[in-house]
Amino acid sequence: MAVTTSKPRVGWSSIEELEVDLLLEAVYRVGGFDFRNYARASLWRRIQNRLRAEKVDTVTRLLDKIVHDASCMDRFVRGLSVNVSAMFRDPGFFQALRAQVFPLLRTWPYIRVWQAGCSTGEEVYSLAIMLAEEALIGRCRIYATDMDESVLDKAREGIYPLEPIQKYTQNYIRAGGTRSFSEYYTAAYGNAIFRPALRDQVVFARHNLVTDGSFNEFNLVLCRNVMIYFNRALQERVHHLLYDSLAHFGVLGLGSKEMLSLMPLRDRYEELDAPHRLYRRMT
């Protein structure tokens, strides 16, 4: 098995570094999931968590278990995938969408949106609510994608625990919501069940930013808080993918810690709202 190794990180032994390289190569070859260019610091923490969860004491033993046990492979992939999401997360971003991006979307007769790395779907429903309030949802198609089919199943259900709903309500208000947030869900058995109509214009599908290509031309692409887990080479690869997926004058939205200014394609965009990481493709 040919593996490209790199300089050991601080706190890693050279053997651990080699074990991790072999593990990630095996996961790619056997399972088709490519974590080889994820940022190693956060990756190592997640691998350590998997060691404890699987009750093995070395990465090599974890590798053996993953290769010979499909359920262990599934658990490993879920454990390494980043599935942190919330409704109207970063309310200022959604305010900026409403104020600066939606007026641009109105200029297109039909609007295609790509929510890349949608996780369990909270941000997808947040976006659908805002588009509905701006009377845009009827001429939209939202493509919500993730590499993990299990989180896509959760997103398709649109059922979330009631516990964080109070926080989500405050986020909705701060994001400029114009109605009562409770109108969008029904409370039952400790869960908030979101209105099925919110996903009428949503297509949930599996797509891997690391290995898959562009599949449509979009007026708005949101890829937020995903690339912070990638190394520089993979970030550049994904930025090219997002650029290729944008229509001319389409808008790209990134996470608060993700900087377009550090990427090779930065000169092909204009800043719409730099603090909220909103950029418009110009060439």
Sequence positions of predicted segments:
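Conserved AdoMet
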Residues: A2-W114
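Conserved class I S-adenosyl-L-methionine
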Residues: W108-E123, C140-Y143
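Conserved SAM-binding loop of SAM-dependent methyltransferases across substrates and taxa
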Residues: T120-I137
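Extended basic-aromatic, gly/pro-enriched interface segments that bind polyanionic ligands
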Residues: R139-L222, V226-L234, L260-S261
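Core SAM-dependent methyltransferase catalytic element
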Residues: L220, L262-T283
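A short glycine-rich, Lys/Arg-flanked "PGG" loop and its adjoining helix->strand segment in the class I
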Residues: E236-H248
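Conserved beta-strand signature within the Rossmann-like core of class I S-adenosyl-L-methionine
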Residues: H248-S256
